[in-house]
Amino acid sequence: YKAYETGQLMHGLTRMVRTGESYIEATKDAVDSYLCTDGRPVSTTTSRYGGDKNMYGQFRDRDYRLYLTICPPYMVKKENGPSTADWKYTDNAQDREFIDLMATISGETYHRLPSSNFKGFTVQGQPHFKNMNWGQGWNASQMGFWVWKYYNTHTVATNANGVNTTDAPLFRIGEVMVNYAEAMCELNKFDQAAADKSINKLRARANVAKMVVNDINDAFDPKRDPSVPALLWEVRRERRVELMGEGFRLDDLRRWKKGDYVNKQPLGAY
């Protein structure tokens, strides 16, 4: 990893995420790529996933990596104006579903809901649109899926840009495991043992059922690119979600000769 130190080498990423300057967001296609907790895609799951007509249902029973990468939906009351830290629960139980969940799977100073901007002002809800923002221009997106993978509240962020000192991973074990899985699949050597050494270790911490190699066939995901074998499609999916927001996707699409994927019409939360 790359170490940062106050007064020596600093950066501005974790502050930027909590400002109106951030334009990092995801598409519906990216959100749909995350599996449900039963290890099935959204097209064939039997979990409590509720479809894409309601964002609470859309995020329900999903891979925890989705919640830690793209801010889950919530809503709170702001009774003293937008530029304050105070908040209260609404009378709708759904509005706190993911507030409660994130309190159990995250730390005190990262990925807790409701989110706040760099000055500590509580954001009223997600999805939070740049053009419809309750007077709060921060932590917002154009299409409703705000990426907050690098969000935390323990980094100094209130006074100036470029003073953050959170260290930056350069090569982490998750990348090693998805590299191994893809290489084994391309060599036609990806079996259950290979899955257990790689993908299933990643899924264990993401609250997703294990990959069972023999269960993956052409019917596993009806929305699969038909030119990609079913097992390779699932291995590539795992790589996509594990490394989401870390700068790998475009190079991967070039390597796979799948540049046409970027021509899809981007869709948002609604």
Task: Place the predicted regions along the sequence by residue.
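Acidic/polar-rich alpha-helix caps and helix-coil junctions
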Residues: 1-270
